[in-house]
Amino acid sequence: MGTVIEGKLRFCIDRGGTFTDVYAEIPGHSDGHVLKLLSVDPSNYDDAPVEGIRRILEEYTGKKIPRTSKIPTDKIQWIRMGTTVATNALLERKGERIALCVTKGFKDLLQIGNQARPDIFDLTVAKPSNLYEEVIEVDERVVLALEDDDDDEGSLIKGVSGEFLRVVKPFDGEGLKPLLKGLLDKGISCLAVVLMHSYTYPKHEMDVEKLALEMGFRHVSLSSALTPMVRAVPRGLTATVDAYLTPVIKEYLSGFISKFDDDLGKVNVLFMQSDGGLAPESRFSGHKAVLSGPAGGVVGYSQTLFGLETEKPLIGFDMGGTSTDVSRYDGSYEQVIETQIAGTIIQAPQLDINTVAAGGGSKLKFQFGAFRVGPDSVGAHPGPVCYRKGGELAVTDANLVLGFVIPDYFPSIFGPNEDQPLDVAATREAFEKLAGQINIYRKSQDPSAKDMSVEEIAMGFVSVANETMCRPIRQLTEMKGHETKNHALACFGGAGPQHACAIARSLGMKEVLVHRYCGILSAYGMGLADVIEDAQEPYSAVYGPESLSEVFRRETVLLREVREKLQEQGFGDGNISTETYLNLRYDGTDTAIMVKGKKTGDGSAFDYAAEFLKLFEQEYGFKLQNRNLLICDVRVRGIGVTSILKPRAVEAAPVTPKVERHYKVYFEGGWHDTPLFKLENLGFGHEILGPAIIMNGNSTVIVEPQCKAIITKYGNIKIEVEPATSSVKLAENVADVVQLSIFNHRFMGIAEQMGRTLQRTSISTNIKERLDFSCALFSPDGGLVANAPHVPVHLGAMSSTVRWQLKHWGENLNEGDVLVTNHPCAGGSHLPDITVITPVFDKGKLVFFVASRGHHAEVGGITPGSMPPFSKAIWEEGAAIKAFKVVEKGVFQEEGIVKLLQFPSSDETTTKIPGTRRIQDNLSDLQAQIAANQRGISLIKELIEQYGLGTVQAYMKYVQLNAEEAVREMLKSVANRVSSETPNSRVGNSVTIEEEDYMDDGSIIHLKLTIDADKGEASFDFTGTSPEVYGNWNAPEAVTSAAVIYCLRCLVNVDIPLNQGCLAPVEIRIPAGSFLSPSEKAAVVGGNVLTSQRVTDVVLTAFQACACSQGCMNNLTFGDDTFGYYETIGGGCGAGPTWNGTSGVQCHMTNTRMTDPEIFEQRYPVLLHRFGLRENSGGNGLHKGGDGLVREIEFRKPVVVSILSERRVHSPRGLNGGQNGLRGANYLITKDKRRIYLGGKNTVHVEAGEILQILTPGGGGFGSNI
């Protein structure tokens, strides 16, 4: 037992998934007590946090506390805890059994979500499972009033947000009772409720809650109470998360509290929330608990390092076993209102913590000539090879081989008796086996290649892992307008300090900070946090003097509420501070920013507008002119300042730091005899030159060569990182297998950052919110190097565009030129997709291209929205631009581009065709595309500065060869499979498969697929395809090319780079004059959105990969002279050999998002009667096809509606005995209740009160179930 103490202890606890960390502040002791326990160890204790407190109390009170007895609390001042109970329950889907209650007509709303697929190349379309087991619909409906609605009958009601509404269907409680009883009979007593427009009219949700509780439900989560913000889908998902997790949390907390005397009634107990604030047990709920542990780490590094150890903004880097959390701090916590965790959207204030699937457990693989790290993890069981459980090689194994992990300082908890150290021998053996494979491959590429050693291979994998973790750090900083290199890296977590120097150097950072408690910083951070009370309500108004007076009134009410809640917890006025926020957006955009109030010059009021404009310009790079600011929400935050832990200074250093011993550690260039120091034996002012190891408890801090570690006044480690001074020299005549992976990451990262720049700086809904764009970089010959995975129909297609421009302009390209094109004959898809191309020169020589393609909402043509269903010639579809320099020698050619867009050429026999109806939006989005290209250029130039132009261009070629190899291997495998299943298909070395399908007009897509089994080459011969059609579903050749490259990438099913190499072993033959290679005059608007889907179905059917999907994008446009709206509607995906097709999702060649139902009704004159799955529309089979969707829209004013769709005649086919999916259908229901079939392509003038009903196709089934 230790010395008996006077006073009371303070406990900070982080109950993680694997370990529970306990930090206790002991009265009279200069240092805290640190304890690390297994979170689950049932043979020794029931609960790790309780056990940690028990052990520490025993040690410092001198009293034995039996595990079976309650723990005395007379020596406990407070307990603060973060817990992964909620996170684990969400990840493992082990929450409470719950049901969902929704407005009638929206039973499937949360399952559909925004329609988007999580991974566009995953043919199984794996989506997270629903949290709810059952759904019940309540008969009620609230409708927002239109601006010109009168109130003759006095039926208008003013909602919480200030919007006027009508209750068109009162709450039907009697009808709901039997449905609730049915849930109780099934053992479900927890309910999540989301009703349409409850953010502004919560009464019906409250009626549901009252009735449910009266009938015996244990817990009800109301979306309107949890997050009163417009958008039903994220609000509803948040309610399901809360209903799913809160009972689990309450049960755990109740069990924890019951282990103490008096149920901790006299001890202040607080729990960490996702927003970095503490809350008492009574206010700790599921939707605010998911980031409980990571939030403690952010509080920990921000409150102990920023301002004390550095003035630079900090990047938090928390590397664990399976993932790494990245965050940022610059004097205030960066928060988001909405994020996605474990595949589920949560809408609540939370710290902006980005997670990447790379950690100590990330698997190491050598595939297709490149090193790959993750995203799969070996997990805690069996873990890495060194854990002695038969695991696979992981990052931890690489660190062990290099000497970054020291077995002497790692707990001996492995082996059958859990008493063995890490297994170095087994790890080396596994690496030696892998080295054999790698060196055989390298010799096959270059007979003179020298064998790589185990250490070189391990270092290579660590380098690739570091680059994987650098990508989210660059994204976190640069997408918000910050320079990454101007930050310091705050490193914590078990594995982070081993990688910190290398990551900082790669990012251009000069400073790394490692907290003295880095291994338990999340626990330590609990003691630095304040109690937070948040309150928010919707308010919809134009920002201005009149609305601000209402804002201040609402703020006053909300501030009173949070103050009262804090006062109830014992906070006096002197310990309470408050913050106010407005959620603001520009009119016509969906991009809202939560703006913290700042005092005006005279201190009399908060000037939210000025702060919004500043933040908007910083994040998006521009300001919008002549646009109103709209208020969305009013929010206040009450802060109860607590008695936090205080940083303690350490003693000044003796003359020479004590070296414990030396170890061999492998760095770039070879082995180094490296001294090891213990942090506990180092003092303020000690300086340690790298290479060195500093042991900090269970954390290993690696100080690399050319770095210097300094012990600070507070006992933390500051590492000065010497930046790379010269470019890296690599051989250009052969690809280095490590650098190949790193360049893959760098090239893809550049394309992704271009995409984020375009999304940030664009203003149109199509680009900014629906994400209908794509960005890429190209080698000097126009070959695709990297294409970020945005919209599949754009993938690979831009290479044809770049090469056409290269041929067209020839020597007439100059530095400072930017090209624009959208014409199908110039490699375009359809006219709304405008491509901006920037050639880049070095010393007068063309060295690469960057390009961005975005869907512009308007480019002219015979109908608003430029998507006419009945166009017969290209000139009817809008402005068609083959080649134009939108920037010439650095000067933006506004007059020229305006002329092209506003005065498109038309056929001489026709009347004039209208030009674009939104020229300012076109100009703004073109400038956004130019900015995205410029971002790509600057990033590639940084790469060239680091490696040299020759090396970068060489690796532009090598990444293409790498992708080519992957596709060749896949084609060989497919050929062998097909020939074994159907021997007659093989002649010699070749396998031949023929497939065809029919468009709704009877046109044939015919494919003869021939695969050379030896060479891994394929011919896609579309000879036999029908001629050009007198309609608009002709598809330019680039569309078919995009469909083929998409299919190949899906079939490879490995995260290879998407580039020109994917098409290198492929020949695509398209007969000229067919509707897949139409004439220059052909109408093509439907080819991109309809025919592309049908080509994809034919290709995947030929490969026997999966049954046909819905085969359509179900394009809907409507509007009048004052507005326009465009959407694509999902459907059913085809089933495959081992999976059912996914229902109600965007399939294959698109992945654009659906507008939330509440936003849809708020901004447009519509009433959405139904949006749900079209049950049983998927084809039956051994594996069932996915169901399509039903969408019923009532128009509340006269509009012109256009529908452009396919699969209304021919059904999506099943495969291998699977049945066909149901074909789609489009109907107009008139005011006199007639149901009129519209066919697949039509334009109709709709009157107020008429309803459009769209039934999208289901997917085909796979395999016979007979």
Curated annotation (Swiss-Prot):
Domain of life: Eukaryota
Disruption phenotype: No morphological phenotype, but high accumulation of 5-oxoproline and decreased concentration of glutamate.
Compartment list: Cytoplasm
A Gene Ontology BP annotation from the UniProt entry: glutathione catabolic process
InterPro entries assigned: ACX-like_C, Hydant_A_N, Hydantoinase_A, Hydantoinase_B, Oxoprolinase-like
Tissue: Expressed in roots, stems, leaves, flowers and siliques.
Catalytic activity field: 5-oxo-L-proline + ATP + 2 H2O = L-glutamate + ADP + phosphate + H(+)
Keywords from the named record: ATP-binding, Cytoplasm, Hydrolase, Nucleotide-binding
Listed GO CC annotations: cytoplasm; cytosol; plasmodesma; plastid
GO molecular function, one term: ATP binding
Keyword Cytoplasm attached: yes
Its biological purpose: Catalyzes the cleavage of 5-oxo-L-proline to form L-glutamate coupled to the hydrolysis of ATP to ADP and inorganic phosphate. Acts in the glutathione degradation pathway.
Similarity-based family: Belongs to the oxoprolinase family.
Record-given protein name: 5-oxoprolinase 1
Lineage, broadest ranks: Eukaryota, Viridiplantae, Streptophyta, Embryophyta, Tracheophyta
Designated gene of the protein: OXP1
